Amino acid sequence: MKLKEVDRTAMQAWSPAQNHPIYLATGTSAQQLDATFSTNASLEIFELDLSDPSLDMKSCATFSSSHRYHKLIWGPYKMDSKGDVSGVLIAGGENGNIILYDPSKIIAGDKEVVIAQNDKHTGPVRALDVNIFQTNLVASGANESEIYIWDLNNFATPMTPGAKTQPPEDISCIAWNRQVQHILASASPSGRATVWDLRKNEPIIKVSDHSNRMHCSGLAWHPDVATQMVLASEDDRLPVIQMWDLRFASSPLRVLENHARGILAIAWSMADPELLLSCGKDAKILCSNPNTGEVLYELPTNTQWCFDIQWCPRNPAVLSAASFDGRISVYSIMGGSTDGLRQKQVDKLSSSFGNLDPFGTGQPLPPLQIPQQTAQHSIVLPLKKPPKWIRRPVGASFSFGGKLVTFENVRMPSHQGAEQQQQQHHVFISQVVTEKEFLSRSDQLQQAVQSQGFISYCQKKIDASQTEFEKNVWSFLKVNFEDDSRGKYLELLGYRKEDLGKKIALALNKVDGANVALKDSDQVAQSDGEESPAAEEQLLGEHIKEEKEESEFLPSSGGTFNISVSGDIDGLITQALLTGNFESAVDLCLHDNRMADAIILAIAGGQELLARTQKKYFAKSQSKITRLITAVVMKNWKEIVESCDLKNWREALAAVLTYAKPDEFSALCDLLGTRLENEGDSLLQTQACLCYICAGNVEKLVACWTKAQDGSHPLSLQDLIEKVVILRKAVQLTQAMDTSTVGVLLAAKMSQYANLLAAQGSIAAALAFLPDNTNQPNIMQLRDRLCRAQGEPVAGHESPKIPYEEQQLPKGRPGPVAGHHQMPRVQTQQYYPHGENPPPPGFIMHGNVNPNAAGQLPTSPGHMHTQVPPYPQPQRPQNGWNDPPALNRVPKKKKMPENFMPPVPITSPIMNPLGDPQSQMLQQQPSAPVPLSSQSSFPQPHLPGGQHFHGIQQPLGQTGMPPSFSKPNIEGAPGAPIGNTFQHVQSLPTKKITKKPIPDEHLILKTTFEDLIQRCLSSATDPQTKRKLDDASKRLEFLYDKLREQTLSPTITSGLHNIARSIETRNYSEGLTMHTHIVSTSNFSETSAFMPVLKVVLTQANKLGV
């Protein structure tokens, strides 16, 4: 699309890439005249302002010159990275002079803008170029084969690259090499190009076209490959661009024939080596890919020829073209619309003729508005492929599972004269781990669950606890896996039975501290864990003494006592007891406040009386522990849990642990935990977790922990999940409860935990921790993603079906079985379609013996004669990598009907039967000999394509020869009678020849090439073509061997993969182009064994259209 234009008949030069803003210098051309036939000359500098929508370029400065110019370049001499200095303008004049201008002075309007000039050349200077490595070096070319190298630091004395070429001729083009700073190339209209080495001061190679019709109008070096260059021809009879490689200078590497008439100028983009501009006498400006010859873009131009074309160094999408109609146009290869250009033409027309009626009526002229109304939008398409500078050099994207996918387009470093730089497209998949401690703790938890080592895991957590509360929680969790869990809970609450016994004993003053210590079995135990005999005797004596002291307080059984029946309380109690009225006796005792007597009598009166008495007692008693005693006696623990002061939550929990029944234990602990959780005190809220642990209530533990702890950090969530997992395992082991069903809150936490694990790359662990029995959409979606990330089938989804149906190969038809001493039939002059002549009797086919196939198929008895037809071959056999070459000794016959059965040849008395294809597939697995069979199977006349036949060696049966002998695979010649003889041939030890497998990334090459050959063979009718394809199939083994050994360079393997992709898309022309590229850019000795035959295969495939 056109961006700007300047109405000048001039040579052009862009400002260097370091300069900003972008300038375009123009110098009056010495080859053309403008429409005014003016003889004045000038230098002008225009600014490129792409923000301005108009087509006009702003003129910054004009310098009137006395010279007209054949060539103009703008070099970056003495410029820094900031572009403060504008470099130097170098102009080639028509009188052999070279003038150096200061652009900054021209822009500033100074009069003295010439830095230096020299007229050493003879004739006009048509060729100029600046060395990109040493910007002070400028090469120039003129008539009489004159080439000078100018040093801008010492402009007075130039040097020559060597002796002048003979015969003398004009120098039309000159260019410095883009990779090697001392290499220079020049070209002349005669079609000859010369490459100079400034270090040797002589030409090193000359390139010319053999047709002698190549009139060089353009020369350009490859931006990346030091040995490649292009030459353009101005001759209308040969309007081509030739791409040469100096390593193969006998003929052009590639010829671009996109122009219809001679080419006037070319320019190779430094930003993208796949963009080559060319303009010719056919009034076309084409942007082509020199590597493929494809035209990527055609600029919309007028019918005028362009004599100069250049890329903008700073903006790689912009180019300029100078045409013979006196206009310099600036274009963009990124496409756009030409509506602005059309509108400008309409505006010019209107301004020239006016838009009012010339007769003064003041009415607008309708015809001038009609083109504007009927005009359609014209869109110019951009390049067919994205240019290199807009391709992302690097990129990154996060994916599920903590994967970081990054790519980078790495250009391999080039060397002098080395291969073409290859753009290596690398994609890296990295695992990003940000929470290493989180993963470590998660791994420890998984190991504890898998090994069932919960006690040791809890102990480690206790030892590592930094707070007392954390230590208590893990201690409570540990108790779940130990014996006497309730007793251990009491100990954790501070109620140790041994310590309580000591306190009670001291309170009763029965024994001193020393005796208490003796009564404690733990204290008197010896170091080996057993009690000493002395300790046992002492304890026994103490027990007898206590019983004796207690018996002294009982009333004496001897003597008499008085039974009073008076009218006082005692007498009434006595009368009630004598009559068996326990209820009245108890009432009298309660009335007299004799509580102990009432309880004793109530016990004798039965449970019902005792219960009523206890209630009356508790109603009258007002001590501090009455409610506790009431709960103990009445077993009303819910009252204690609901009514106790929460400061005594430990005591309430201890009472529940001591007395509660298993069926009510969990509910009471939950009730106490709920009271603590609902209390405003944060300390009590955290203690509720201990109650929920005792109850085994995972859901409430999660809810309570979430309220009390900060769950935003991954380690905080890890703390919770560790407790939840251990508690669930404890409930599962101790209470035999189903823990698979989870609540909403727990499922959310487990899902969050699984997400964190997946984000750290632990997909399997995340899948293991994810709840199973839940229908929550987010969890089901996460499970689906985890299964897919791990490559496992997703529950509820069918596996993708195989797009083809597996077919079982048919079993071989049964062969004839000969009886004992049965003589074979003699058949003469037999032939077999597609078969081979068997060798004469006694000839051992070593190539058909597979040492690993022993014992795979049954064999015939030793005294039976078996008749076996030769192995049928639908086509020339394709040898496997470990098979010897097949020998075709019989000329091919016409194809027989499918139902044609070949006659059975005469064979030796002992013959190896051929097994069915399924048995042949098992020949790589050694096994024990199979028992003898009286039948053998023959294969069907056809086997699937690509399956190779391997000879089979079998052990003999009991009726055959001894085990130390082996049967040779012997076939008789057709028609030759064979006697009833045996040949005992001892098998020689053979060593299996093995090759490395082809790497998986290159296996597609073998599959693609072999499949292409098979398709060609099935379509080819010419015997000569089939022989070529057969030979190609064998010689491609050299390629496969190199792939196995991985001795090919990355450039070659990458090119082979490109060829394989072109074969898959049936684009054989592209494959041949890539083949030429590989051959021209690689070492010949590395590819000579297989690349010629690969070209044969591609050519035949293209010819056959398979």
Swiss-Prot record:
WD repeats: 4-47, 68-111, 120-160, 166-206, 209-254, 258-298, 301-342, 397-430
A Pfam family the protein falls into: TPR_Sec16
Oligomeric form and interacting partners: COPII is composed of at least 5 proteins: the SEC23/24 complex, the SEC13/31 complex and SAR1. SEC13 and SEC31 make a 2:2 tetramer that forms the edge element of the COPII outer coat. The tetramer self-assembles in multiple copies to form the complete polyhedral cage. Interacts (via WD 8) with SEC13. Interacts with PDCD6; interaction takes place in response to cytosolic calcium increase and leads to bridge together the BCR(KLHL12) complex and SEC31A, leading to monoubiquitination. Interacts with KLHL12.
Signal peptide segment: none
Source superkingdom: Eukaryota
Positions of region (Interaction with SEC13): 161-471
Protein name as annotated: Protein transport protein Sec31A
Gene that produces this protein: SEC31A
A single GO cellular-component term on record: COPII vesicle coat
GO molecular function terms listed in the Swiss-Prot or TrEMBL record: structural molecule activity
Annotated positions of the Phosphoserine modification: 527, 532, 799, 1049
Family: Belongs to the WD repeat SEC31 family.
Membrane topology qualifier: Peripheral membrane protein
Cell compartments where the protein resides: Cytoplasm; Cytoplasmic vesicle, COPII-coated vesicle membrane; Endoplasmic reticulum membrane
Region of interest called Disordered, as start-end residue ranges on this chain: 859-980
GO biological process: COPII-coated vesicle cargo loading; endoplasmic reticulum organization; protein transport
PROSITE patterns per record: WD_REPEATS_2, WD_REPEATS_REGION
UniProt motif ALG-2-binding site motif-2 (ABS-2),: location: 842-848
Disulphide-bridged cysteine pairs: none
Protein's job: Component of the coat protein complex II (COPII) which promotes the formation of transport vesicles from the endoplasmic reticulum (ER). The coat has two main functions, the physical deformation of the endoplasmic reticulum membrane into vesicles and the selection of cargo molecules.
Modified residues (Phosphothreonine): 1047
Crosslink feature (Glycyl lysine isopeptide (Lys-Gly) (interchain with G-Cter in ubiquitin)) location: 647, 1103
Entry domain remark: The ALG-2-binding site motif-2 (ABS-2) contains a PXPGF sequence that binds hydrophobic pocket 3 of PDCD6.
Polar residues composition-biased segments: 917-939
